[in-house]
Amino acid sequence: PFGNWMVLKRMVIFIAGWPTYWRIAIANKLKIEGLEHLKDLPNTNVFFISNHQTYFADVISFYHIFCNLKWGFGKKLMPIYLFSPRATIYYVAAKETMKSGLIPKLFSLAGAILVERSWRAEGVNVKREVDTSAGDNVTMGLKSGWVISFPQGTTSPYAPVRKGTSHIILSNRPVVVPVVINGFRRA
């Protein structure tokens, strides 16, 4: 599979999963709708397209939901899934965000596909060439499992969708699953 060793990914998901489970499932009472649409998806070439409200809670919630789905627990998150998580999950993330500290670096081991943003760096608008290797890495992720993308490329609401997403869809023809995240700004 693409990315880090599966054993390492499973360990990171297990370690990060326990404290985040409490926050997501107990304190904030994550509400999941539309889970029935995910049950019969193939194990590879599935592309989740989502809005982005926080730096990490969105992705962590996806991991909890997908691992829970693997075990067949339905809408109620049961942390036993952390003992054998779905490890073929990948997510597109800004390289600068994932290199900014120990916790982001740890999370990146769980399946980050790092992208060098062409329009923004360290909070400042920039103009640089598009990172063409990012599309290749997303393709490898799709061949190995499920990929989560936040095509707005920012946590700002109503930002335009970046063009790379359409290129990935056209070249890979994945199953595309649109996702709406709501409420993390209040969490």
PLM features: what roles do these ranges have?
Residues 6-25, 104, 108:
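Short hydrophobic helices that act as membrane-entry/anchoring signals
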Residues 26-187:
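Soluble catalytic domains of membrane acyltransferases
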